Amino acid sequence: LVNQHLCGSHLVEALYLVCGERGFFYTPKAGIVEQCCNSICSLYQLETYCN
């Protein structure tokens, strides 16, 4: 799960794993797709989308 392309349902699943009970907010304008699907993101970057 470290430093890889995450798109669609894979991205959502990764957010559930990283954020756990905190949950997360998904706003396309935040650039998570550009950051994690079009390029590669880290667990630390994913965690910035947690609540």
Curated annotation (Swiss-Prot):
InterPro entries: Insulin, Insulin-like, Insulin-like_sf, Insulin_CS, Insulin_family. Disulfide bonds join 7-37, 19-50, 36-41. SMART domains: IlGF. Pfam families: Insulin. Keywords: Carbohydrate metabolism, Disulfide bond, Glucose metabolism, Hormone, Secreted. Its main location: secreted. One of its GO terms (cellular component) is extracellular space. It is found in: Secreted. SUPFAM superfamilies: Insulin-like. GO terms for biological process: cellular response to oxygen-containing compound; glucose homeostasis; glucose metabolic process; positive regulation of protein secretion. The keyword Zinc does not apply. The keyword DNA-binding does not apply. One of its GO terms (molecular function) is hormone activity. Heterodimer of a B chain and an A chain linked by two disulfide bonds. Belongs to the insulin family. PANTHER family: INSULIN (PTHR11454:SF9), INSULIN/INSULIN GROWTH FACTOR (PTHR11454). Insulin decreases blood glucose concentration. It increases cell permeability to monosaccharides, amino acids and fatty acids. It accelerates glycolysis, the pentose phosphate cycle, and glycogen synthesis in liver. This is Insulin.
